[in-house]
Amino acid sequence: MEGAGENAPESSSSAPGSEESARDPQVPPPEEESGDCARSLEAVPKKLCGYLSKFGGKGPIRGWKSRWFFYDERKCQLYYSRTAQDANPLDSIDLSSAVFDCKADAEEGIFEIKTPSRVITLKAATKQAMLYWLQQLQMKRWEFHNSPPAPPATPDAALAGNGPVLHLELGQEEAELEEFLCPVKTPPGLVGVAAALQPFPALQNISLKHLGTEIQNTMHNIRGNKQAQGTGHEPPGEDSPQSGEPQREEQPLASDASTPGREPEDSPKPAPKPSLTISFAQKAKRQNNTFPFFSEGITRNRTAQEKVAALEQQVLMLTKELKSQKELVKILHKALEAAQQEKRASSAYLAAAEDKDRLELVRHKVRQIAELGRRVEALEQERESLAHTASLREQQVQELQQHVQLLMDKNHAKQQVICKLSEKVTQDFTHPPDQSPLRPDAANRDFLSQQGKIEHLKDDMEAYRTQNCFLNSEIHQVTKIWRKVAEKEKALLTKCAYLQARNCQVESKYLAGLRRLQEALGDEASECSELLRQLVQEALQWEAGEASSDSIELSPISKYDEYGFLTVPDYEVEDLKLLAKIQALESRSHHLLGLEAVDRPLRERWAALGDLVPSAELKQLLRAGVPREHRPRVWRWLVHLRVQHLHTPGCYQELLSRGQAREHPAARQIELDLNRTFPNNKHFTCPTSSFPDKLRRVLLAFSWQNPTIGYCQGLNRLAAIALLVLEEEESAFWCLVAIVETIMPADYYCNTLTASQVDQRVLQDLLSEKLPRLMAHLGQHHVDLSLVTFNWFLVVFADSLISNILLRVWDAFLYEGTKVVFRYALAIFKYNEKEILRLQNGLEIYQYLRFFTKTISNSRKLMNIAFNDMNPFRMKQLRQLRMVHRERLEAELRELEQLKAEYLERRASRRRAVSEGCASEDEVEGEA
């Protein structure tokens, strides 16, 4: 038991030289023996232990059973056994996650320990003992939760020097507890070491649930009894003739008695010449491994009467123990008979010579089982009929009892009426009618009854006050424990996120290394290339295997992100699959590393922002990105800021009704583009999703809203992004209106896409200014960037960037306008400039430009490039460049129109000439 392990050093310290005394015992002087009990008990520190009644059992044998409880400080476990002398505990109660409760209306001394798995009902001898146990259990639980962890083998072990601070905090916590419930004094004789000297519990306290432990404890006690009896029957002549006082006996402690269920290695060795009283003390010491110092508390100078009383008590205890042993022997005998019967059946089965005989035995047993089953069914039916009959009889008895009670009440009422009338008649005879009788006895009875009620109410009030104080302290302490556990959990989650981010970084570097090796080797070495292909395949499949084998992973890379986009793009080419996995790992790593350092302060700033007002602070916050929980609200405000002069109530519903009345010319093209909208998003590919229907209605409503544009390819992606964030059709519709009609130039989505072409030329000039080396490299290989960047501007990167970065771009785009698109377009090329410069072939550059935007995973780095490295970037310069290139483009378009008109005129003149020539020939043929 745990108590033995804890008490061992204390006992040895309180009795120095115990080992020498055990080897060569000497008789102590009489003056030292007189105070031996007091000194031994004072030297022992207070331990939380004692006898409590535990309510348990099943069915008709449920009831209170006395158990010995003791607390283990290292494990925060409350162990209990049948007696204090048992070597092995019956069971334990985990107090680390338990709460305590006491009912004011319950029987005195009853309280409960509630754990997540069960509720244990206990009863103390007195109310004071109950409050003492509750308060001590609260303190032990708080000490366990507030205790510092074991010092690690790292430099952090220096934190172990904060012991005084922890003691100070513990003192403060105890002081706070005292404000709720006053400290309860230790009940004498009911709690602690002294409680173990009480008599053993009765026989009915044997635990049938823990029969194995009971057998072990009984065998241990039997061995102790044999040793005690052998010591007690020594010849009396061996007693010390020099002194009539018993010799003080000490013994070395068990080496490991703290472990429940483990017996001590060395049994205690008695002194050579003990008296009868010392023999009894030695027996108690051997039986009680948890408290090896009980025998130190026995008073030395006893009279003959006290010795006789001790012997009688020992005889009584042995008699009770003998009864319990007989009961145990009966139980074991029944178990042995069952085992022998099973053995006989097995022997008969094995002794059968042929399979037929064995089959006949099996059939015989089956028939017996069937017969027994039928008998059980018959008995069950009989039991049910008897139970039904008994219930009917019980109902009849209850009805008769109610009838009898009613008759008795009537009789009692009639007797009271008769008594009152008799008293009244007597009073009328004894007192004249003009004199009012005085009834002091009745007044006294009323006063006493009222006083008794008041006393009862005072007792109830005191009980409820005590319960309230205890529950307040319990709630206060549980709340503090919960906060402390929450802080620990938060710290562990932060540490796990950091470790997972580092793991993602290492894995991405590993995959990148495999990719480079694969590119470097090529087809030179078939064995090496085959090995690399296997490693790449294992790396690509490792995520799914790990997710299936480890069900408690903190935050695995999900297939879809929070907006439904695929986190790892599904490419067909093996190299692109590996690149997509690397990009997903890097993105996950940057996200995890930025959770605490960046995202948490950003969320706090957004939470404290309050009402949205255009300002420089809001501009910086939008550039940093809007947290997901605030993004719908912020986008609605930004859209309303753009379209408040266009917005009219009921406009969207009116447009929908107009579309239902007649079909729009662009409806067919819209229907074709619905299936091509974000094939990498589950909300638009799932057959049961409502997003495609919402998108169809939004695009049709916009076609009726803006007839000059109607519908243009690319609007479906803009509306889809708005739907994913805002989720409401009308909000997404007005977001599309804000982008097309207020943010983008007027002819951005017209038939000629004039403004879009102008922006491509402006981007070329800005790239030449900001990234001249890159533009020279692209010009050397004749790479036309507009083939890649045209779609960026048309759909605001909707098909290019991963969703985490894309939505940050949109946050700033909805507030600042198209300038943000130019900034991020330049930043994307700056981000990948080194990779592009390494490529020395135009075809390789085009292949890389197809997916290089998906390799961007560090959103913070990209944002820093866009809004810091690309400065200065003035809107005035952007307008001037747009104006210059618009004039050039319009001149080119006019020239093209003129050339087109000249060509059409020449072709028409040719057709006329050809038609005239053909007619003359026909006429000639007709004349002929």
From Swiss-Prot:
It is found in: Cytoplasm; Cytoplasmic vesicle; Cell junction. Residues 298-416, 875-913 form a coiled coil. The modification Phosphoserine is found at residues 436, 915, 920. Residues 45-142 form the PH domain. The keyword Magnesium does not apply. Residues 1-169 are annotated as: Interaction with CADH1. One of its GO terms (cellular component) is anchoring junction. Residues 1-19 have a biased composition (Low complexity). The keyword Amino-acid biosynthesis does not apply. Gene3D superfamilies: Pleckstrin-homology domain (PH domain)/Phosphotyrosine-binding domain (PTB), putative rabgap domain of human tbc1 domain family member 14 like domains, Ypt/Rab-GAP domain of gyp1p, domain 3. Keywords: Acetylation, Cell junction, Coiled coil, Cytoplasm, Cytoplasmic vesicle, GTPase activation, Phosphoprotein. One of its GO terms (biological process) is positive regulation of GTPase activity. Residues 625-817 form the Rab-GAP TBC domain. Residues 1-39, 225-275 are annotated as: Disordered. InterPro entries: PH-like_dom_sf, PH_domain, Rab-GAP-TBC_dom, Rab-GAP_TBC_sf, Rab_GAP_TBC_domain. It comes from the Eukaryota. Pfam families: PH, RabGAP-TBC. Residues 295-433 are annotated as: Interaction with RAC1. 'Armus' means hinge, linker in Latin and ancient Greek. This is TBC1 domain family member 2A. It comes from Homo sapiens (Human).
